[in-house]
């Protein structure tokens, strides 16, 4: 706490300096250089009361006091050069909002030193100032045009970046006409290729592709593109494979029907042979019975003739 109080005593306490930073435009008003002598009548005030009541400043209140360098113009004991004043003004410029004040540290240095006291080493820096001031004014004009409908409290630096990103989020670039034209050209080319391939396929029928030899097909395909030739030969190969599969299937079905018919015929022949065998067996049995009857009749006749003799030798 003691260190912070000691740092706060070294800060500029003049209300004119704070109003010079916050309210006035250095391009319109001449700034009177204060003498280097001490100012005992100026009361030292704390760092948190440096901002006037009626002034509007974009500097955050939470800025630490140690980040603000002391003013060389208010030092009662030490003589500062113009380069030290330049360093103090550039550091003070970093603590305020440059967008709200619309000034650069080079403007403050030029107003403080004057055109007749410009050292030689500042001439190169002054040439760089013109380009930087032009770029700074263009950037401020763009931000003012973008946020001209917002209140003054919402134009601070912390609030500009979210609106800026939100603006870019909602206004994304639309596809270029060259991309749409290239896509339409690709669709047209693909449609034309499809028509050409259809014309090539319609030129030959399926029967012609199957019956045509490879040499004859190559002779007819001269002048066509490689993709069309490959597609047509693939179609011919597919048709031939399909025909071969259908032929094999037909042959298998035909052979199956032939075998079934032959089987039926063989079954019928077996039945006929069975009937013939049964008929022959019946005839055999009949002939056997007839043969037995004839044998019995012959034996009886032979026995009767031997029992009744009729010859004259029988009586002798």
UniProtKB/Swiss-Prot annotation:
Residue span(s) of domain bZIP: 231-294
Places the protein is found: Nucleus
Annotated region described as Leucine-zipper, given as residue ranges: 259-280
SUPFAM superfamilies found in the cross-reference section: A DNA-binding domain in eukaryotic transcription factors, Leucine zipper domain
SMART domains: BRLZ
GO MF: DNA binding; DNA-binding transcription factor activity
Residues spanning the signal sequence: none
Keywords tagged on the record: Activator, DNA-binding, Nucleus, Repressor, Transcription, Transcription regulation
Biased composition annotated in UniProt, kind: Low complexity: 55-77, 177-198
Disulfide pairings: none
Record Pfam families: bZIP_Maf, Maf_N
GO cellular component, one term: nucleus
Composition bias type Basic residues, residue spans: 130-144, 160-172
Membrane spanning residue stretches: none
Function noted in UniProt: Acts as a transcriptional activator or repressor. Implicated in the regulation of cell-type specific gene expression and play a role in inductive events during lens development.
Family: Belongs to the bZIP family. Maf subfamily.
Protein name stated in the entry: Transcription factor MafB
